[in-house]
Amino acid sequence: MKLSLLSTFAAVIIGALALPQGPGGGGSVTCPGGQSTSNSQCCVWFDVLDDLQTNFYQGSKCESPVRKILRIVFHDAIGFSPALTAAGQFGGGGADGSIIAHSNIELAFPANGGLTDTIEALRAVGINHGVSFGDLIQFATAVGMSNCPGSPRLEFLTGRSNSSQPSPPSLIPGPGNIVTAILDRMGDAGFSPDEVVDLLAAHSLASQEGLNSAIFRSPLDSTPQVFDTQFYIETLLKGTTQPGPSLGFAEELSPFPGEFRMRSDALLARDSRTACRWQSMTSSNEVMGQRYRAAMAKMSVLGFDRNALTDCSDVIPSAVSNNAAPVIPGGLTVDDIEVSCPSEPFPEIATASGPLPSLAPAP
């Protein structure tokens, strides 16, 4: 993932943690395909689901297309700035699908490099099924994550208009930004420092493609096909290794061969404003999933009134559970952790047996 870094908030939390049934379970409407759902407006999404899983995700795999959609969902939604609006300028439409509708403009933004093929594939799906691009991006994200063990089941609301304007430039925080710049940009969009850390759980499934081409698709943690806390643990390990022949853009030393470390991740893990939240994400896959789901529910309605949208979460499949406990990778110990939260002791996390890992590129 060449990243950029993706009603009341209480209502968002409640909605985000109430797991829906599904896919197609427990509803009162029977769709033409025989599926059961809560609302007739949701029926079209079963057809989109089959199309995405068969073609876009190449048989429901947790591979590169999932990582691309995680970039896209964040880059689309974060094009939202109340500060610009207050200054009398267009502040962006948020999660409106403008990255697809206005790809001729938005794909020229440096943060969106390498997304053209994925955007065009999504455009074809949206047109074929007659769904809005904003809805499609949110749906494809939830479906894609369901292919990755351990992922939370994301909320999916439909009803976004397909009318949008191009996002203003320079609204996507990037891996070379300092922490203050990231927190200021995310704060403008309505996210607290804690929520910034929560959203970075997406990096559990991430790899980089454009930051260091010599180590193409090098993962950001040792389990890039599993949604787990290893990303938070491993980003706190001392950087000792240069995984490629030279360091790439916004790259820091890594704890073992094959793993890529983004400068923004390393800084956020150690900054006084975010370090304690970061540390709290290391020891519980369940807590990480709950927090990510809540933050994604909030991001998915940037620019929209959630009460005007229809809940079709029951169409989203559930991911396979991940029962593996968090570990400090083999060859390392807790002494290799750069503890950065002064107010709380580092959690007790087991150390894996075996030698220091050496990671292959993510698929």
Swiss-Prot record:
Glycosylation sites: 162, 358
Active site: 75 (proton acceptor)
Lineage: Eukaryota, Fungi, Dikarya, Basidiomycota, Agaricomycotina
Binding locations of heme b: 203
Listed Gene3D superfamilies: 1.10.520.10, Peroxidase, domain 2
Species, as recorded: Coprinopsis cinerea (strain Okayama-7 / 130 / ATCC MYA-4618 / FGSC 9003)
Alphabetic keyword roster: Calcium, Disulfide bond, Glycoprotein, Heme, Hydrogen peroxide, Iron, Metal-binding, Oxidoreductase, Peroxidase, Pyrrolidone carboxylic acid, Secreted, Signal
Similarity annotation: Belongs to the peroxidase family. Ligninase subfamily.
Residues binding Ca(2+) 2, per UniProt: 204, 221, 223, 226, 228
Pyrrolidone carboxylic acid PTM positions: 21
Cofactor(s) listed in the protein's UniProt record: Ca(2+); heme b
Localization: Secreted
Intrachain disulfide bonds: 31-43, 42-312, 62-148, 276-341
One GO MF term attached to the UniProt entry: metal ion binding
Protein name, as recorded: Peroxidase
BP term (GO), one: cellular response to oxidative stress
Superkingdom of origin organism: Eukaryota
InterPro entries noted in UniProt: Ccp1-like (IPR044831), Haem_peroxidase (IPR002016), Haem_peroxidase_sf (IPR010255), Ligninase (IPR001621), Ligninase_C (IPR024589), Peroxidases_AS (IPR019794), Peroxidases_heam-ligand_BS (IPR019793)
Principal location listed in the UniProt entry: secreted
Catalyzed chemical reaction(s): 2 a phenolic donor + H2O2 = 2 a phenolic radical donor + 2 H2O
Residues where Ca(2+) 1 binds: 76, 94, 96, 98
Secretion signal, residue range per the UniProt entry: 1-20
Primary gene name: CIP1
EC numbers, comma separated: 1.11.1.7
